[in-house]
Amino acid sequence: MTTLAKPPRKLSREVRREQLIEATISVLAVRGYARATLTEVADTAGLSHGLVNFHFTSKDILFSETLAYLSEEYTQNWQRAVALAGPSPAAQLDALVRADFLAEVSTPQRLAAWCAFWGEAQSRPLYQEKCGSKNAIYIETLEQICAALLAEG
């Protein structure tokens, strides 16, 4: 497993949290959900186990926040793509589909982390809650674009 570059000692709380979330994504990609440990996350981030516990009081909280981070990243990605596509429904649909394949959100590590979470979603309703509202927004946007395409004939 790759260890991230050794970070400076003093970083903001948000930067440290993001660093730990990125390390969690890396660990999930290699080890999977059940075999990922906080120690591996700390090692991958180049931080102490204590810092992981300081920022995330449990593995469940760290994983939940990692899923929320991935979900927000994905949502911002497709929303930006649709907004940049302009007013044409055909261009918006094209942008929406292409957004799923952009390197920022479809790296092997990120896809593996998503798969790890999908495998746990049935037994962890919290994960469904974390992504459910964002998924509903995606579906609503897709339906609106398709309705606009149909209206154009």
For the regions a language model picked out, list residue spans one by one.
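Amphipathic alpha-helical segments that line or abut small-molecule/effector binding pockets
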Residues: E22, A68, A90-P108, A112-A116, ...
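Short helix-capping/turn signature of helix-turn-helix
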Residues: F56, A116-S123
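Solvent-exposed, amphipathic alpha-helical segments
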Residues: Q19, A23-V30, N77-A81, A113, ...
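Short coil/turn segments at alpha/beta junctions that flank glycine-rich nucleotide-binding fingerprints
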Residues: V30-A34, A85, T107, E152
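N-terminal intrinsically disordered/low-complexity leader segments
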Residues: M1-V15
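Amphipathic alpha-helical linker/stalk segments
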Residues: P8, T66-L96
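Helix-turn-helix
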Residues: Q19, A23-E65
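Amphipathic alpha-helical packing segments from all-alpha helical-bundle domains
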Residues: E72-T75, R80, S106-C115, P125-E152
